[in-house]
Amino acid sequence: MTTSQKHRDFVAEPMGEKPVGSLAGIGDALGKRLEERGFDKAYVVLGQFLVLKKDEDLFREWLKDTCGANAKQSRDCFGCLREWCDAFL
């Protein structure tokens, strides 16, 4: 699987205070929906990812239900967070 530049940029460094839109798969529309639901920073979405025990099906379903992410968007976001965790946790 090839990854986007956005994905590579995200996983290349600590998360810090990056906005939710910095996550691969999360564009302006999904980012706005997530922000409206309290997920304004990438680390808040990471928290949900960890609460769901890094389970791909559960996380992708949550992302779909929370902000309307499609299959590609949820797959990209999951892969981004999984790779970030492998590098930094």
Curated annotation (Swiss-Prot):
<comment type="function">
    <text>Non-specific DNA-binding protein that plays key roles in mitotic nuclear reassembly, chromatin organization, DNA damage response, gene expression and intrinsic immunity against foreign DNA. Contains two non-specific double-stranded DNA (dsDNA)-binding sites which promote DNA cross-bridging. Plays a key role in nuclear membrane reformation at the end of mitosis by driving formation of a single nucleus in a spindle-independent manner.</text>
</comment>
<comment type="similarity">
    <text>Belongs to the BAF family.</text>
</comment>
<keyword id="KW-0539">Nucleus</keyword>
<dbReference type="GO" id="GO:0042803">
    <property type="term" value="F:protein homodimerization activity"/>
</dbReference>
<dbReference type="GO" id="GO:0006325">
    <property type="term" value="P:chromatin organization"/>
</dbReference>
<dbReference type="GO" id="GO:0007084">
    <property type="term" value="P:mitotic nuclear membrane reassembly"/>
</dbReference>
<dbReference type="GO" id="GO:0005654">
    <property type="term" value="C:nucleoplasm"/>
</dbReference>
<dbReference type="InterPro" id="IPR004122">
    <property type="entry name" value="BAF_prot"/>
</dbReference>
<dbReference type="GO" id="GO:0032480">
    <property type="term" value="P:negative regulation of type I interferon production"/>
</dbReference>
<keyword id="KW-0963">Cytoplasm</keyword>
<dbReference type="Pfam" id="PF02961">
    <property type="entry name" value="SAM_BAF"/>
</dbReference>
<dbReference type="GO" id="GO:0003677">
    <property type="term" value="F:DNA binding"/>
</dbReference>
<keyword id="KW-0238">DNA-binding</keyword>
<dbReference type="GO" id="GO:0005737">
    <property type="term" value="C:cytoplasm"/>
</dbReference>
<comment type="subunit">
    <text>Homodimer. Heterodimerizes with BANF2. Interacts with ANKLE2/LEM4, leading to decreased phosphorylation by VRK1 and promoting dephosphorylation by protein phosphatase 2A (PP2A). Binds non-specifically to double-stranded DNA, and is found as a hexamer or dodecamer upon DNA binding. Binds to LEM domain-containing nuclear proteins such as LEMD3/MAN1, TMPO/LAP2 and EMD (emerin). Interacts with ANKLE1 (via LEM domain); the interaction may favor BANF1 dimerization. Interacts with CRX and LMNA (lamin-A). Binds linker histone H1.1 and core histones H3. Interacts with LEMD2 (via LEM domain).</text>
</comment>
<dbReference type="InterPro" id="IPR036617">
    <property type="entry name" value="BAF_sf"/>
</dbReference>
<dbReference type="GO" id="GO:0000793">
    <property type="term" value="C:condensed chromosome"/>
</dbReference>
<keyword id="KW-0597">Phosphoprotein</keyword>
<dbReference type="GO" id="GO:0000785">
    <property type="term" value="C:chromatin"/>
</dbReference>
<dbReference type="GO" id="GO:0005829">
    <property type="term" value="C:cytosol"/>
</dbReference>
<feature type="modified residue" description="Phosphothreonine; by VRK1 and VRK2">
    <location>
        <position position="3"/>
    </location>
</feature>
<dbReference type="GO" id="GO:0045071">
    <property type="term" value="P:negative regulation of viral genome replication"/>
</dbReference>
<feature type="modified residue" description="N-acetylthreonine; in Barrier-to-autointegration factor, N-terminally processed">
    <location>
        <position position="2"/>
    </location>
</feature>
<dbReference type="GO" id="GO:0005635">
    <property type="term" value="C:nuclear envelope"/>
</dbReference>
<dbReference type="GO" id="GO:0051276">
    <property type="term" value="P:chromosome organization"/>
</dbReference>
<dbReference type="GO" id="GO:0010836">
    <property type="term" value="P:negative regulation of protein ADP-ribosylation"/>
</dbReference>
<protein>
    <recommendedName>
        <fullName>Barrier-to-autointegration factor</fullName>
    </recommendedName>
</protein>
<dbReference type="GO" id="GO:0006979">
    <property type="term" value="P:response to oxidative stress"/>
</dbReference>
<keyword id="KW-0158">Chromosome</keyword>
<dbReference type="GO" id="GO:0015074">
    <property type="term" value="P:DNA integration"/>
</dbReference>
<dbReference type="GO" id="GO:0042802">
    <property type="term" value="F:identical protein binding"/>
</dbReference>
<feature type="modified residue" description="Phosphoserine; by VRK1 and VRK2">
    <location>
        <position position="4"/>
    </location>
</feature>
<feature type="modified residue" description="N-acetylmethionine">
    <location>
        <position position="1"/>
    </location>
</feature>
<dbReference type="GO" id="GO:0160049">
    <property type="term" value="P:negative regulation of cGAS/STING signaling pathway"/>
</dbReference>
<dbReference type="GO" id="GO:0005634">
    <property type="term" value="C:nucleus"/>
</dbReference>
<dbReference type="InterPro" id="IPR051387">
    <property type="entry name" value="BAF"/>
</dbReference>
<feature type="modified residue" description="Phosphothreonine; by VRK1 and VRK2">
    <location>
        <position position="2"/>
    </location>
</feature>
<feature type="domain" description="HhH">
    <location>
        <begin position="20"/>
        <end position="35"/>
    </location>
</feature>
<dbReference type="GO" id="GO:0045824">
    <property type="term" value="P:negative regulation of innate immune response"/>
</dbReference>
<keyword id="KW-0007">Acetylation</keyword>
<dbReference type="GO" id="GO:0003690">
    <property type="term" value="F:double-stranded DNA binding"/>
</dbReference>
